[in-house]
């Protein structure tokens, strides 16, 4: 099969979650919509659950299994089903819920970026070409506006364990990029639906993992984190650029740049004793490459 047939190409951004393009390395994942004005990238880390490991084995199941098998072979299906309902379910019946990690939000050349009612959207542009190389796992978006061509490249490295994003312009100093991270605090509140940008919905009846930290660190890193039910999690986005990097504490702004790079790492206490320390070390290592 020709190599180009392993590449998915698009002439417009995704409007719903099902159409967004997935990136991942088996542990860290992202869903990319491809908006050119304000972009929201949904993030996942496979060990982020609503609680830690738990023992749910039903200790009575094994002893009752021969009896149930005998009932089935005798054709006594109702009796077998009754025993199954009594002896074969986990204890407790419910299990921890998988939780999304959060979002990485990018606003390119916006006068007002992340207002209280912002939604992901694309600019009035001259050209648009998005692609996902299925063999390399690299997403590329190229668009032109006002005589400037912008190129965004993204992939998630397995060796470095970070999401890597690079935004370039073909004209010097044409990039003014606002970067923030966020996470829905409670799923039972009205909030933006990540699957349908711009749509406000009401979630389920339980709280999501609490976001207790959302601020910059060291003038070049955005950190989010929280703890609930004994599970600690954190994610950090390290930002470098060839322009000026401003630090308003709640976000970072790359101003007058021709190239911006972001390295995003994440960790939880389901896998690491010190998630925050682990991901900051990972960010330092990626930044040094």
Model-derived regions, located:
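Aromatic-residue-lined binding/catalytic grooves and analogous aromatic/hydrophobic interfacial grooves
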Residues: 1-283
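A short, hydrophobic C-terminal helix/tail in secreted or cell-surface proteins
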Residues: 284-289
């Amino acid at each position: 099969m020709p190599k180009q047939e392993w590449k998915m190409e698009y002439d417009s951004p995704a409007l719903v979650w099902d159409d967004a393009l997935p990136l991942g390395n088996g542990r860290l994942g992202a869903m990319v919509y491809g908006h050119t004005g304000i972009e929201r990238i949904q993030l996942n880390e496979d060990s982020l659950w609503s609680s830690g490991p738990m023992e749910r084995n039903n200790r009575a199941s094994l002893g009752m299994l021969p009896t149930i098998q005998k009932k089935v072979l005798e054709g006594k299906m109702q009796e077998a089903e009754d025993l199954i309902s009594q002896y074969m379910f986990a204890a407790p019946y419910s299990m921890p819920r998988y939780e999304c990690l959060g979002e990485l939000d990018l606003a390119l050349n916006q006068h007002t970026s992340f207002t209280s009612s912002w939604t992901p959207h694309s600019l009035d542009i001259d050209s648009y070409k998005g692609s996902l190389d299925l063999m390399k796992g690299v997403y590329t978006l190229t668009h032109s506006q006002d005589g400037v061509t912008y190129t965004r490249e993204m992939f998630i490295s397995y060796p470095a364990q970070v999401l890597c994003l690079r935004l370039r312009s073909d004209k010097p100093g044409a990039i003014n990029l606002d970067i923030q991270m966020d996470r829905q605090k409670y799923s039972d509140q009205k909030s933006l639906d990540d699957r349908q940008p711009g749509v406000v919905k009401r979630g389920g009846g339980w709280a999501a993992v609490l976001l207790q930290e959302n601020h910059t660190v060291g003038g070049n890193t955005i950190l989010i984190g929280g703890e609930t039910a004994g599970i600690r999690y954190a994610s950090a986005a390290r930002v470098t650029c060839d322009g000026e990097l401003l630090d308003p504490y709640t976000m970072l702004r790359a101003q007058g740049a021709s190239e911006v790079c972001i390295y995003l790492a994440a960790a939880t206490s389901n896998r690491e004793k010190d998630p925050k320390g682990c991901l900051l070390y990972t960010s330092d290592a990626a930044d040094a490459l």
